[in-house]
Amino acid sequence: MGIFVCRNSLRMLNVRWLYHRCLSLYNSNHGFNEAKIKEKLAQFTGGSVDLSKMDNGIAEICINNPSRMNAFTGTMMIELEERISDLENWKNGKGLIVYGAENTFCSGSDLNAVKAISNPQEGMMMCMLMQNTLTRLQRLPLISVALIQGKALGGGAELCTACDFRLMTEGSEIRFVHKQMGLVPGWGGAARLIHLIGSRHALKLLSGALRVHPENALELGLADNILLGTEDGFLSEAENWIMPYIKGPSDVSRAVKKVIISGREQKLEDALRTEKEIFGTVWGGLANLQALAKGTKHK
């Protein structure tokens, strides 16, 4: 009985931690009015953000606006937030692949929406919405991969940094073009880029608006692999690539992602305590007991 109570207490601690991790960065205390900016963005229609969830625990998000190089319209920004909310509540999920329709990843914000949100106040509201959304994407208990075909420009480059891994195809490129627009990244891309490749390399990419091709991205640590297949087969290749990392029970895979999130975002002492709590949710669990019975540790 005592063990049961202890394990349930640990689970409750983990639930509270996960809830805290999924909280948005900004709320009304920061001057963020989500309803107001969504009402503004809803005026700029077109495209879609499509979500599919498969029985193998892999979800796919497709940025679907090919006539605009998969640029985010206002309604697409809203839809992305809704898709992330859906995935936060998907208890059996293990992996996520983010890709763009018709062999192009994403070219950032649609210029029609950008031109209409020209004052700093509304621009910062849009920035806060997208930072909230992409931070929640990064904190999902799913191992995520950005499949980059064609161009990942501006906000598209920022989007790919919110995923755990990046797979690039031959001829693709990542480019932070913000400086050419008289801007800096606003969706969290600069902060995430520094964590990925270091401040010195990040400064070069941002200040020079440099084109990062697959080989260079691999060398920098921005990309994790280069896919060499055909256009019709890249999504299947991405699924095959992620499969070894999500193999096994979903609760174990999700626990692995959670300890990585805590280690990345919390102070050492807090991360250690969180790791202990998450460890308690899988110790003595079904997967652990089955592995012990089979003696699979060194196999």
UniProtKB/Swiss-Prot annotation:
Per the UniProt record, one Pfam family is ECH_1
Q: Sorted alphabetically, which CDD domains does this protein's record hold?
A: crotonase-like
Question: Molecular function terms in GO for this entry?
Answer: carboxy-lyase activity; methyl/ethyl malonyl-CoA decarboxylase activity
The free-text function statement in the UniProt record for this protein reads: Decarboxylates ethylmalonyl-CoA, a potentially toxic metabolite, to form butyryl-CoA, suggesting it might be involved in metabolite proofreading. Acts preferentially on (S)-ethylmalonyl-CoA but also has some activity on the (R)-isomer. Also has methylmalonyl-CoA decarboxylase activity at lower level.
Keyword Cell inner membrane listed? The answer is no
Recorded superkingdom:
Eukaryota
Q: Where in the cell is it found?
A: Cytoplasm, Cytosol
Reaction(s) catalysed (UniProt annotation): (2S)-ethylmalonyl-CoA + H(+) = butanoyl-CoA + CO2; (S)-methylmalonyl-CoA + H(+) = propanoyl-CoA + CO2; (2R)-ethylmalonyl-CoA + H(+) = butanoyl-CoA + CO2
Q: What is this protein called?
A: Ethylmalonyl-CoA decarboxylase
Q: Which Gene3D superfamilies match?
A: 2-enoyl-CoA Hydratase, Chain A, domain 1 (3.90.226.10)
Q: What organism is this sequence from? A: Xenopus tropicalis (Western clawed frog)
Task: Identify the enzyme class.
Answer: lyase
Instruction: Provide the alphabetized UniProt keywords.
Output: Cytoplasm, Lyase
Any S-S bridges, and between which cysteines?
A: none
Report the SUPFAM superfamilies cross-referenced here: ClpP/crotonase
Q: Give the UniProt family note.
A: Belongs to the enoyl-CoA hydratase/isomerase family.
The UniProt entry's GO CC annotations, sorted and at most eight, read: cytosol
Give the E.C. number(s). 4.1.1.94
